[in-house]
């Protein structure tokens, strides 16, 4: 459905439909809907908060007398329909949308309700906060409410205690200005209170969502009193002046560590495999899997994010799409040869794969350990950090019986493997998860961690943060994933420092 057709169907929704819409919602849905619609209207948020508190104490028979949605339509006579429908999509009220004559699948493709940081009409921070409410367990919500109320008691306390409806507490904090949404693009926003709480309690995914939302939409601060500066966190997850970008640059790093420079950081080679075909050369038939490899939608988001982040660090990024196995090997060898005057080398491969192997675009796989042998065989990379990042499934290939193409790369001493480091999207034997619109969990989390922690933490610690963040994620069907790292670093290695003026591009530009 095109955007024009959606707008046409929205006009068919009448204000007289709203009481029936409200009756079809349960209390939890009504709370979420009220939060999304009224959260950025400070003048009416207090009134709606009181209405919700009354409904929470009332019996179900009193609900037909609720007019929250009708009041909203009166407050926005020209635009209420598009806000309401997007909010209904976000909370997943499919039955209500069907009764309004709308198609859920078409609305889902238009509004992307499953992508927390992307919105069409609803305030971006409200959508992100709702997503967080859905992600937290009841126990996590309860601890959050108690902790924030204890440390930020302002005025009369909210006489409501059911943390299941976390949006009610968020509305209360908005009306007390403990958090601020800023304008429609989050300029002048201040959600640092929540970010600090999430970081301190190891809820890194939730903190990252808020940071990315502000970075994606805000362009400047509305006023000096309500800046939208999001401070990095110190080692304990506490944000303060000493952890600002400027201060982080002067914070002492570990002694006897290898610190890479922006001027000579090196090459970041990105091999992005999205489209696959079966090589027709008879010599390669033995290496082909029995079935065609599918399109890897979403991988361009990973490529773009890696390009942005490593460019920010000073690396010379070289990104290539859809390379066959020999072209992959050629570009890897060329990067090694041109690393004589560089301090490190990064190779990122985004593809399909199986255990210890990644596919070329021609469906011929290379063994990952052989790729590492290539990197370690070049004298001009001896003892230099060599980071291989792999986003690919690593399941055992019991059914396909595909063979990796053999690479000739010889090493003469175990010392050649010093400072070799591999970062895998998943532990051996398991698939790697990738969102078809926003990219993979692993690559996006890796880039987030580098942006946030590279000034203060060495590479091995950054990868540990990534493992924790990804392990805490859950898919729509409760899917899980655990990244894996391994290597032979002989000392701590730090990425080049970045300054506050370095531009960090958000996760999902252009969607």
Swiss-Prot record:
Its EC number is 3.4.22.61. Keywords: Apoptosis, Cytoplasm, Hydrolase, Immunity, Innate immunity, Protease, Thiol protease, Zymogen. GO terms for biological process: apoptotic process; defense response to Gram-negative bacterium; innate immune response; proteolysis. It catalyses: Strict requirement for Asp at position P1 and has a preferred cleavage sequence of (Leu/Asp/Val)-Glu-Thr-Asp-|-(Gly/Ser/Ala). Transmembrane segments: none annotated. The active site is at 352, 393. Effector of the programmed cell death (PCD) activators rpr, grim and W. May play an apoptotic role in the germline as well as soma. Role in immune response, required to resist Gram-negative bacterial infections by regulating DptA. Fadd interacts with Dredd, Fadd promotes cleavage of Dredd and is necessary and sufficient for enhancing Dredd-induced apoptosis. Belongs to the peptidase C14A family. This is Caspase-8. It comes from Drosophila pseudoobscura pseudoobscura. The gene is Dredd.
């Amino acid at each position: 459905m095109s955007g024009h057709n959606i707008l046409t169907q929205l006009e068919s929704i009448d204000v007289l439909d709203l009481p029936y819409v409200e009756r079809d919602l349960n209390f939890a849905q009504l709370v979420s809907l009220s939060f999304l619609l009224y959260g950025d209207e400070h003048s009416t948020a207090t009134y709606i908060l009181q209405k919700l508190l009354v409904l929470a104490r009332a019996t179900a028979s009193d609900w037909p007398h609720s007019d929250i949605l009708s009041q909203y339509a009166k407050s926005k006579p020209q635009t209420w329909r598009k806000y309401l429908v997007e909010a209904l999509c976000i909370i997943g009220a499919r039955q209500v949308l069907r009764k309004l004559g709308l198609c859920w699948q078409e609305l889902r493709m238009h509004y992307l309700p499953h992508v927390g940081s992307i919105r069409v009409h609803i305030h971006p921070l409200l959508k992100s906060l709702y997503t967080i409410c859905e992600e937290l367990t009841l126990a996590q919500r309860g601890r959050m409410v108690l902790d924030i109320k204890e440390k930020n008691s302002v005025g009369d306390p909210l006489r409501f205690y059911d943390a299941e409806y976390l949006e009610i507490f968020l509305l209360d904090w908005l009306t007390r200005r403990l958090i601020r949404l800023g304008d429609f693009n989050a300029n002048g926003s201040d959600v640092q209170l929540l970010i600090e709480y999430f970081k301190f309690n190891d809820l890194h995914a939730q903190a990252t969502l808020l940071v990315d939302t502000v970075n994606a939409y805000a362009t400047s601060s509305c006023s000096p009193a309500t800046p939208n500066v999001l401070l990095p966190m110190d080692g304990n997850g506490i944000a303060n002046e000493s952890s600002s970008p400027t201060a982080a640059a002067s914070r002492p790093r570990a002694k006897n560590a290898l610190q890479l420079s922006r001027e000579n950081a090196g090459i970041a080679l990105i091999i992005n495999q999205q489209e696959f075909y079966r090589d027709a050369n008879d010599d390669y038939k033995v290496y082909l899997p029995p079935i065609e490899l599918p399109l890897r939608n979403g991988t361009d988001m990973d490529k773009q994010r890696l390009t942005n982040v490593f460019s920010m660090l000073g690396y010379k990024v070289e990104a290539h799409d859809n390379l066959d196995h020999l072209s992959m090997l050629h570009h890897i060898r060329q990067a090694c040869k041109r690393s004589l005057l560089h301090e490190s080398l990064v190779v990122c491969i985004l593809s399909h794969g199986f255990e210890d192997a990644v596919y070329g675009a021609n469906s011929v796989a290379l063994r990952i350990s052989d790729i590492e042998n290539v990197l370690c065989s070049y004298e001009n990379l001896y003892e230099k950090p060599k980071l291989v990042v792999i986003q690919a499934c690593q399941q055992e290939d019991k059914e396909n019986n595909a063979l990796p193409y053999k690479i000739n790369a010889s090493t003469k001493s175990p010392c050649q493997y010093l400072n070799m480091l591999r970062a895998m999207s998943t532990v051996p034997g398991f698939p790697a998860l990738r969102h078809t619109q926003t990219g993979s969990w692993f690559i996006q989390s890796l880039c987030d961690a580098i942006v946030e922690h590279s000034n203060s933490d060495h590479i091995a610690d950054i990868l540990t943060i990534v493992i924790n963040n990804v392990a805490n994620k859950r898919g729509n069907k409760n899917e899980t994933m655990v990244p894996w790292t391994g290597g032979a670093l002989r000392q701590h290695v730090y990425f080049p420092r970045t300054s506050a003026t370095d531009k960090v591009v958000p996760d999902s530009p252009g969607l």
